[in-house]
Amino acid sequence: MSSAIDTKKVVVEEIASKLKESKSTIIVDYRGLNVSEVTELRKQLREANVEFKVYKNTMTRRAVEQAELDGLNDVLTGPNAIAFSTEDVIAPAKVLNEFAKNHEALEIKAGVIEGKVSSVEEVKALAELPSRDGLLSMLLSVLQAPVRNLALAAKAVADQKEEQGA
């Protein structure tokens, strides 16, 4: 019997460490999805480097307490799956939100974004943000705009002087 308890303690430690280490964690209710839909969801999450696992709620509750994320205990009812991402904050929210739009059975319940418990609305707002690369390209274009405008103004002045001199 003690080996079963030891195994459960290891699982609780694993969940707690994933909750602490991941940049983004999303809890979803997958009830109503068939096997092929869950397989497709897992494939999409794997492609985004997101780990997707189903744990018992009692073990998840203990891990949540260890990770000091007590705000999640309210959503740990019914069948839940957890998506962990250690690389990208936006990736799990984006993939799960897109999948939920096409499959009404998938319900986003809550999340942990950079160590802070987040509501469904916050997770969905995060999902609507562009990816990191998209944000960087937007920033780059904003930074380039003044230089580009200066170059265009200098060219216009040069063209005007050239016309006057001709």
UniProtKB/Swiss-Prot annotation:
GO terms of biological process kind: translation
Signal peptide (residue range): none
Pfam families per UniProt: Ribosomal_L10
Lineage: superkingdom: Bacteria
GO CC annotation, single: large ribosomal subunit
Keywords: Ribonucleoprotein, Ribosomal protein, RNA-binding, rRNA-binding
Subunit structure: Part of the ribosomal stalk of the 50S ribosomal subunit. The N-terminus interacts with L11 and the large rRNA to form the base of the stalk. The C-terminus forms an elongated spine to which L12 dimers bind in a sequential fashion forming a multimeric L10(L12)X complex.
HAMAP family listed in its UniProt record: Ribosomal_uL10
Family: Belongs to the universal ribosomal protein uL10 family.
Descriptive protein name: Large ribosomal subunit protein uL10
Source organism per UniProt: Bacillus velezensis (strain DSM 23117 / BGSC 10A6 / LMG 26770 / FZB42)
Gene: rplJ
